[in-house]
């Protein structure tokens, strides 16, 4: 079970635990600006905000569990197996895999309003 928490104060507090009895070889990952993110259906993005978080890194691609970008926007990937829906690829849509969502959003959004 994972827990995420956000505190609304004058400052920014965000936290999350990965409460598992086993490891996915997670590590602190820092992705600098202009590091190429290779998305499965959306090509490569090398023009994005820097971010830091916990990730499993595969082939140089950080698969973030949670992260915060340089603008202060934070995001966590939580597990909701009973309500998750995975759609087929659709033309003329942004086709983002679930494991790509955090770098996709945090790479281009400065605020929750932009992310919506």
Please annotate each region the language model reported.
Residues 1-93:
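A contiguous strand-loop segment
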Residues 75-77, 91-116:
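Alpha/propeptide regions of enzymes that mature by internal proteolysis
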């Amino acid at each position: 079970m994972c827990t995420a928490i956000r505190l609304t104060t004058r400052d920014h507090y965000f936290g999350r635990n990965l409460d598992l009895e086993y490891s996915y070889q997670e590590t602190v990952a820092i992705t600098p600006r202009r590091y190429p993110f290779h998305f499965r259906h959306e090509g490569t993005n090398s023009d994005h905000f820097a971010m830091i978080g916990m990730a499993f890194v595969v082939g140089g691609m950080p698969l973030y569990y949670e992260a915060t970008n340089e603008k202060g926007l934070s995001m966590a990937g939580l597990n909701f197996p009973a309500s998750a829906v995975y759609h087929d690829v659709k033309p003329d849509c942004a086709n983002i895999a679930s494991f790509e969502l955090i770098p996709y959003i945090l790479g281009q959004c400065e605020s929750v309003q932009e992310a919506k």
